[in-house]
């Protein structure tokens, strides 16, 4: 966005070995419905933007950490070449957010191994290829907790329960259906973990019902044997660098205070995405990035700032179990677009009729969900270079065949290099679907 707006030089600094941020480990689908009008995995979405930066001539510094940012826009960096400073005409902060750690919770017990955030577990499994445990309890039902419940199940672990202290889940309704109900994983609302058991390694946890004041109710304690406790208890905007520069932080969101052009309280320093506030969808983060990049380029060139207005109305997807009656509810939550229609399907003499859908695609999806449900399978494959490569089926496959298909995929080893979209396995399991690569990798 900054380059397109006329910036002479744009430098993108990334502390990881590759651009893309958290998207690299978000191998599941559901991204891009707003931005690209199609459903992508996280790596696919990230690679599209990576390619755009190359095409625009953006200089990318990977494996580079920013250690300091001053109010006059001097950026201090360090990488394998040493420590250096960049004097910028404008700076855009896009560091994202971090997970709320165990230290922010009131968990009794020792500090054994096996307690980790859901994002850490996601990186272990999807990037490193390590299984952090076999018997899992998840505290918190945000989307990453729900997604990791499914991911761990696909990899052969047993998810004993997802515990949520509130009356409803903060996760998307479609994730509750596809990540929990698809695999019969119990969601324990108004429950929290009161104690962690084990010294060297987690051996189990005690959970309890909470009252209206979110206090554990005496006599409702229940012990669950497990070797891993995953925490999905909220996200906090990353703001340590910004504080050094003197950027004002909102006391409620913990994010940066910005104006309509995403300029912070420090002139020439802009912020976008999850450093401002935690967003539901990456598509909205991208929109904010475009706004901030354009405004930063205008500021650097001394041009007046013109506020960007995005034409598309932002539609938040439905959240929580409140959109579901019970597990015998005949209604289907449609996932073909962000609206998430609640569609009732009824059998009639000549087939099926639907009620509640806004389009023909929703009608077709709902009938398919009732008669022969399908899912797009997303997972990883090992490579000859020890890297884990994200893959997916190029079309939905029968839900009941997913376990069988996982076994086929896990028996294979990929040879690098490989490119985005390359077919790895044709007609896997006789489903008519091909397994394709969702991120390019060189040797």
Residue ranges of predicted features:
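Signature of N-terminal electron-transfer/Fe-S-associated modules in redox systems
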Residues: 321-414, 418-426, 433-437
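Residues forming the flavin
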Residues: 1-325, 334-342, 347-353, 357-363, ...
């Amino acid at each position: 966005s900054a380059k397109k707006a006329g910036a002479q030089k744009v430098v993108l600094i990334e502390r990881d070995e590759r651009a893309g941020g958290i998207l690299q480990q978000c191998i599941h689908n559901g991204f891009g419905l707003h931005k690209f009008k199609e459903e992508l995995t996280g790596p696919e979405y990230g690679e599209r933007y990576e390619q755009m930066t190359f095409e625009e001539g953006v200089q990318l510094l990977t494996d580079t950490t920013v250690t300091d940012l001053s109010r006059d826009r001097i950026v201090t960096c360090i990488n394998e070449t040493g420590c250096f400073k960049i004097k910028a005409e404008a700076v855009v902060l896009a560091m994202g957010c971090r997970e709320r750690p165990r230290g922010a919770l009131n968990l009794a017990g020792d500090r054994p191994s096996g307690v980790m955030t859901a994002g850490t577990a996601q990186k272990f499994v999807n990037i490193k290829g390590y299984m952090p445990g076999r018997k899992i309890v998840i505290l918190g039902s945000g989307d990453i907790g729900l997604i990791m419940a499914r991911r761990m199940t696909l990899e052969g672990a047993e998810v004993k329960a997802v515990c949520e202290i509130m009356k409803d889940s903060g996760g998307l309704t479609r994730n509750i259906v596809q990540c929990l109900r698809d695999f019969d994983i119990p969601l324990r609302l108004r429950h929290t973990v009161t104690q962690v058991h084990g010294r060297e390694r987690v051996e189990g946890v005690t959970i309890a019902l909470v009252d209206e004041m979110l206090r554990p109710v005496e006599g409702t304690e229940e012990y669950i044997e497990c070797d891993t406790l995953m925490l999905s208890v909220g996200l906090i905007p990353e703001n340590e660098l910004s504080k050094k520069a003197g950027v004002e932080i909102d006391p409620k969101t913990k994010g940066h205070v910005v104006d309509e052009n995403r300029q912070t309280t420090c002139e020439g320093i802009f912020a976008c995405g999850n450093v401002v506030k935690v967003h539901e969808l990456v598509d909205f983060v991208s929109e904010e990035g475009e706004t901030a990049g354009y405004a930063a380029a205008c500021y650097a060139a001394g041009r007046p700032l013109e506020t960007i207005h995005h034409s598309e109305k932002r539609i938040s997807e439905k959240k929580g179990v409140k959109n579901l009656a019970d597990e015998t509810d005949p209604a289907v939550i449609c996932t073909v677009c962000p609206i998430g229609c609640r569609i009732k399907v009824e059998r009639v003499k000549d087939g099926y009729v639907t009620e509640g859908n806004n389009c023909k695609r929703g009608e077709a999806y709902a009938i398919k969900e009732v008669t022969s449900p399908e899912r797009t399978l997303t997972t990883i494959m090992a490579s000859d270079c020890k890297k884990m490569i994200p893959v997916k089926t190029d079309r939905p496959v029968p839900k009941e065949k997913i376990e069988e298909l996982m076994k086929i995929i896990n028996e294979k080893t990929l040879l690098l290099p490989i490119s985005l979209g390359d077919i790895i396995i044709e007609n896997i399991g006789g489903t008519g679907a091909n397994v394709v690569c969702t991120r390019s990798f060189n040797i």
